[in-house]
Amino acid sequence: MTQSGQAESETPSTLIHCVRDRQQAKRELERLANRSTGNSQKQAMATVEDILDTVRSQGDQALITLTERFDGFRPEPLTVAPEELEDAWRKTPQKLQSALELAYRRIQDFHQHQRPNDLMVQGIHGEQLGRRWRPVQKAGIYIPGGRAAYPSTVLMNAVPAQVAGVEQLVMTSPAGRDGQINRTVLAAAHLAGIREVLRLGGAQAIAALAFGTETVPKVDVISGPGNLYVTLAKKAVYGQVGIDSLAGPSEVLVIADQSARVEQVAADLLAQSEHDPLAAAVLLTTEASLAEQLPSHLEAQLKGHPREQICRASLSNWGLVVICESLERCAQLSDHFAPEHLELLVEHPHAIADCIKNAGAIFIGPWTPEAVGDYLAGPNHTLPTCGTARFSGALSVETFLRHTSLIEFNRSALEATANAVRELASSEGLHSHAESVRIRFE
């Protein structure tokens, strides 16, 4: 093991390390899944709790003071004027406008199919039993800033809320030191019909949405990814408001066999690693020759790369190649990791896809790079990370909906079930439960 705790590489490259041993592979995948935890999270949580308390007690003034401290400008006003949104769209190049419009249409088209239907059934004694869906009234969406601008995330969060029927949608995103939010992000907000935009980032933005201030409305649900402080803030306010998920750093896992082209594999791993130094890029392959060729292709594609240092940090710390004896073993290891994004660069991808139990999104075949899912395929790109695909899924229309049970008994239905209700109530020692049934027949 190296001082950093990584397994020694079986390839000559120090850029990404390779293992063959089954148990070592599982240990490495577990290390990658836990890459966002540790002492830094405990320290950050103390800061987050202080920020939440300050915003709750001081409102707008806290937002201004905290933004000046952390982001280097005074957000006065806190809100972006509608004219700024319109201006951002007008100044967006035509080709980019067209690309955003295409993405918006495709995301809308897919999410329209996610609307659940109300349910009403009749029981055996004539009772009516149902489930009714209704949207939350207010939702807040957080759009990260920092290393890159994410107009696609605006669309991916706004569309399901709109399809759900949310009445009021509030967007918040960190601004630069000049006080301006990225123009393309504002253009995407304009396209999506968002009218309330805040120049706020970090835990203070989440606090504002969760508690409300003089300017910021208190919302019912908060969605959207962010850095560690944003994620911890969402975790802390959950229960006061609903949240979509606790997003960690992004990841991709590629399963490849002899049919895969090594240059495509390299490009897809780099497409993930360029996000963040904490992004994880994993290759599971049955082909030792593919694993051996990969480092040189990564190096070649990194030459002149505008985000080379981020890619190198990601791959050297959180990159992994595992040589497996079979595709079945690849699928088992993938399920153990439960990746956010799973690419299947294999000869018979549907056979593998059918075996997969845990993945945020599966990209099937050589013509489906993760990038199409990130931008405009249609399914949501806000996905579970760091192993949470074992028990959760993508952001969806249902994130912004609540379902209410509907129950209507008539006299005969209550008569037919009254003895059982009273018996169950008595077994739990709840006298008035039983009495509430009996008294109806006096």
Swiss-Prot record:
Pfam families referenced in this protein's UniProt entry, alphabetically: Histidinol_dh
This protein's pathway: Amino-acid biosynthesis; L-histidine biosynthesis; L-histidine from 5-phospho-alpha-D-ribose 1-diphosphate: step 9/9
Keywords of the record: Amino-acid biosynthesis, Histidine biosynthesis, Metal-binding, NAD, Oxidoreductase, Zinc
PROSITE patterns named among the record's database cross-references: HISOL_DEHYDROGENASE
GO cellular component, one term: cytosol
Cofactor (UniProt): Zn(2+)
UniProt key word Amino-acid biosynthesis: yes
GO process annotations (BP): L-histidine biosynthetic process
CDD domains linked to this entry: Histidinol_dh
Any one GO MF annotation of this record: histidinol dehydrogenase activity
EC number assigned by the record: 1.1.1.23
Record-listed substrate binding positions: S250, Q272, H275, H341, D374, E428, H433
Sites where the protein binds NAD(+): Y142, Q204, N227
Cofactor remark from the record: Binds 1 zinc ion per subunit.
Active site: E340 (proton acceptor), H341 (proton acceptor)
Protein residues bound to Zn(2+): Q272, H275, D374, H433
Catalyzed reactions per annotation: L-histidinol + 2 NAD(+) + H2O = L-histidine + 2 NADH + 3 H(+)
Cross-referenced Gene3D superfamilies: 1.20.5.1300, Nitrogenase molybdenum iron protein domain
Record-linked InterPro entries: Ald_DH/histidinol_DH, Histidinol_DH_CS, Histidinol_DH_monofunct, Hstdl_DH
PANTHER family: HISTIDINE BIOSYNTHESIS TRIFUNCTIONAL PROTEIN, HISTIDINOL DEHYDROGENASE HDH
Family membership noted in the UniProt record: Belongs to the histidinol dehydrogenase family.
Function per UniProt: Catalyzes the sequential NAD-dependent oxidations of L-histidinol to L-histidinaldehyde and then to L-histidine.
Protein name: Histidinol dehydrogenase
Organism: Prochlorococcus marinus (strain MIT 9313)
Lineage, broadest ranks: Bacteria, Bacillati, Cyanobacteriota, Cyanophyceae, Synechococcales
